[in-house]
Regions:
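A short, hydrophobic C-terminal helix/tail in secreted or cell-surface proteins
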Residues: 221-225
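Conserved N-terminal phosphate-binding loop of PLP-dependent enzymes in the Aspartate aminotransferase
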Residues: 1-220
Length: 225
C-alpha cells in the first residue's frame, strides 16, 4: 500500500494494534500535538483482545463485564449497505451519509483531539462485511481534510485473501500505518508486525533514543522467519 516504510515486529494482531495506539500517542507527543489522544474505530470492527485493542473493537460482547471501551476510543457507523441502507438510498448516497456522519463525529470530538482512525479493509469477526463501493476513498477524503491518519488492520485480509496482496489495494485504501499478523507465518508461529510509512517515521526517528532497546522485538519467531 506504500512504497517504503519501517517494520516493528510483535507476536499477535492484538499486541500490534496496541502498538499502533502507543506509536501514534508517542509520535504526537514528540511532535508537540499532545491533545491528539483519541482514536476512531467502527461499530462491529474487531482489533484484538487486549485492553487497548478490545477498546478499538466495536463488538459489545467484547466490552461488557470488562469496563470497556477505555476513554479516548470512539466508534463510528458500520459500512453495511445491505443491512443499514435506507429504502431508496443508493450505494453512493449511503457512502456519502457515512462520510458525513464521520465528519460530524470528528467535529463533535474536536479534530485537534483525534490521533488516528483504525479500520479493517473488510470486517471479519463483525460479520464478514464488505465495504460499499467508494467507501474508503470517501472517508479518507474526510480524514485528509482534518489531517487524521488511517491505520489499516490487515490481520485477516493481507497476503492474498481479497485477490490482491493486501486488502488496501482491493478497496483503494491509502494507509499511514498497517497491522499484519496471522498469514505472515501461515499460522505456524506467533508473529505480527506494524508497518509505518516514511512520512510518519522520518519526523520521529531521532526521538527513538528516548525509549532505548526494545528486547520485546527480539523473538525466536523473528529469527525463524
Amino acid at each position: 500500500p506504500f512504497s517504503s516504510g519501517k517494520v516493528f515486529l510483535g507476536l499477535s494482531g492484538s499486541d500490534s494494534n496496541d502498538t499502533q495506539y502507543k506509536l501514534f500517542t508517542y509520535a504526537n507527543n514528540k511532535l508537540g500535538k499532545e491533545k491528539k489522544k483519541k482514536m476512531i474505530a467502527r461499530k462491529k470492527g474487531y482489533h484484538g483482545v487486549t485492553v487497548t485493542s478490545a477498546s478499538m473493537t466495536g463488538l459489545p460482547n467484547q466490552h461488557k463485564l470488562f469496563d470497556l471501551p477505555q476513554e479516548n476510543f470512539i466508534h463510528t457507523e458500520t459500512p453495511h449497505y445491505f443491512k443499514e441502507g435506507k429504502e431508496g438510498e443508493t450505494e453512493e448516497d449511503y457512502v456519502r451519509r457515512l462520510s458525513e456522519t464521520l465528519e460530524e463525529t470528528i467535529l463533535d470530538e474536536g479534530p485537534e483531539s483525534i490521533a488516528a482512525m483504525i479500520a479493517e479493509p473488510l470486517m471479519g469477526a463483525g460479520g464478514v462485511i464488505l465495504p460499499p463501493k467508494g467507501y474508503f476513498p470517501a472517508i479518507q477524503d474526510v480524514l485528509d481534510k482534518f489531517d487524521i491518519p488511517l491505520i489499516v488492520d490487515e490481520v485477516v485480509t493481507a497476503f492474498g485473501r481479497t485477490g490482491n496482496a493486501f486488502g488496501s489495494e482491493t478497496y483503494e485504501i491509502k494507509p499511514t500505518s498497517m497491522t499484519i499478523a496471522k498469514a505472515l507465518s501461515s499460522g505456524y508461529i506467533p508473529i505480527s508486525a506494524v508497518i509505518v510509512n516514511d512520512e510518519l517515521f522520518e519526523p520521529i526517528k531521532e526521538a527513538s533514543g528516548d525509549i532505548g532497546a526494545v528486547s520485546y522485538t527480539h523473538l525466536r519467531a523473528h529469527e525463524t522467519g
